[in-house]
Amino acid sequence: MDSYIIEWLNLVVRWIHVITGIAWIGASFFFNWLDSQLTPPENPQPKVEGELWMIHSGGFYQLKKTMISPSEIPRVLHWFKWEAYSTWISGIFLLGIVYYTGSGVYLIDSEIADLSYGMAVSISLGTILASWLVYDFIWASALGEKGWFPVMISFLLLFGIIWWFHQWFGSRAAYIHVGAVMGTLMVGNVWRRIIPSQTKLVEAVKAGKTPEASLGIKAKQRSLHNNYMTLPVVFIMISNHFPNTFAHYFNWAILITIIVIGATVRHFFNLKNKGHLNIWILPVAMAAIFALIYVTKPDATISNSPDTVTFGTEHIPYALVRTILDQRCVSCHSSRPTDDVFRIAPKGIMFDNNERVHALATLIKIQSVTTIAMPLGNKTGMTHEERVILGRWVDEGASIK
């Protein structure tokens, strides 16, 4: 398929994915907050478990949580499910557009694992499917009722999946695939557990029967799981913009840490919504972020040290830098790319003009020296010595004369 069409598909499907994701996560946050804010009605009413008054958009809203009789089933009953389904469907399409087209250029990194295209796609889809099957088995079985034990097992399995993806895929792809796994668990919870429980609830009401209490309990459990996964998934959605995370040597450990921090912050708000203000959680989460920033600080030696650079303390000539860029970068980052996959310069970054190279010097260092995120999968074979030269050139002022 023409790269121009791929680029437009990427844009449109990504836009849909973001829109539906906002709708889904927004609904999740709202209903978790709503359940915690319900209070007994001022004027007690039969079957009304709680109510909430709100003001928004210039009007007053009264919400009631109630059990109803068959005759009271409304003609129109809104189900919150298509937000989840649409997010997952668009996400899977986006995964295919980005990682399965172009012979898997974003998926396969030969320096990590020498995979064929078919093997890479099989690992991708197989792991996503297997993750849901194992997770659902744990929580649908008696094991899911063992208190904190299944929680710890689930965390360990997730951490194992994170490590697993980093053994096979490029770091960008590994991060996004973890997000795909978590998104699949979330939509699986909606599709296979929450909506079926709600369907049985409606059917019981229509039949004049008392709904099984276990249905609501299990659905609420899966909904809570989704609630804790939202912040980590949102981070993963934006992570590809930050190579200081996915391109770090300990990228898998960074992702695990951020997932734990995100779930912890979500826990703070869940407790707060129930009236328990454990304010200490936020400073601890912030301290963890600052610790992560400190621990993952890049090693400065790459731009100062290697024995392979023969210039010593001499000035790095721009002619040498220009040669490196022409050999390693311009095949993609040009007004007329010659790469077999990219027909348009990624992110519109072009190195044809020397003044533009000077303006982009800091970005060049971040991507190719500090994080070693570029060239993508080191497709053009940039050497350690060449990265050192680029880093020193930027440190010297990025002169183009």
Where are these regions (language model features)?
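Membrane-interfacial entry segments at the cytosolic side of transmembrane helices
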Residues: G144-M152, F250-N251, K272-M286
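Alpha-helical transmembrane segments and their membrane-interface junctions
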Residues: W79, A84-S103, W163-I176, M229-H248
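Membrane-interface interhelical loops and short amphipathic "cap" helices
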Residues: M1-L11, T101-L115, H166-V178, H241-F246, ...
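Membrane-interface amphipathic/juxtamembrane segments adjacent to transmembrane helices
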Residues: S28-S71
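Hydrophobic alpha-helical membrane-embedded segments
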Residues: W15-P44, V181-S197
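Aromatic- and Gly/Pro-enriched helix-to-coil junctions and flexible linker segments
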Residues: E72, I92, Y99, G275-L282, ...
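Long, highly hydrophobic alpha-helical transmembrane signal-anchor segments
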Residues: M1-W24, L143-M186
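Cytosolic juxtamembrane amphipathic/interface segments immediately preceding
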Residues: Q62-F80, E212-G216
